[in-house]
Amino acid sequence: VGGMSTAPYLSTMISEKIEVARIINAIKIIQRTTNLPISVDTCRAAVAKEVLELGVDIINDVTGLKYDTMMPKIIERFCPSLILCAYSKKIITGNQLQETKQLLKKSLEIAKTAKIPRTKIVLDPAIGFFRKKGRNPF
């Protein structure tokens, strides 16, 4: 479930308040109809905190814990499963496989520092993202 598009080539930033409102409405509907795990896409710690308090199972951070410095603390506190995407503010050039690997290593280092268990982490190479100039600040 996402409240804000993460399309890197569009200007899609919205306020945290709007993002939370969109996600919470969707979560409540899903929770009324199923017991399946719920994953939320967000790179903002305040949003993650709100949805984790509602019982969300997975956080998918397209920035690999690199956008919001508070995100690792929130993940450590609630201990959900975590999807880390290969993320760079710069355009990935050269050997994309090697650069993607390094980006994921950096995210894993951030997670390790925050004592996030590796068994809770899924890595996403984010192929198609950050391969050319984007318009989002994250």
Residue spans of the language-model regions?
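Generic structural signal for well-ordered alpha-helices
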Residues: 23-27, 48, 69-72, 101-109
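Acidic (Asp/Glu)-rich catalytic clusters
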Residues: 52-53, 71-82, 115-117
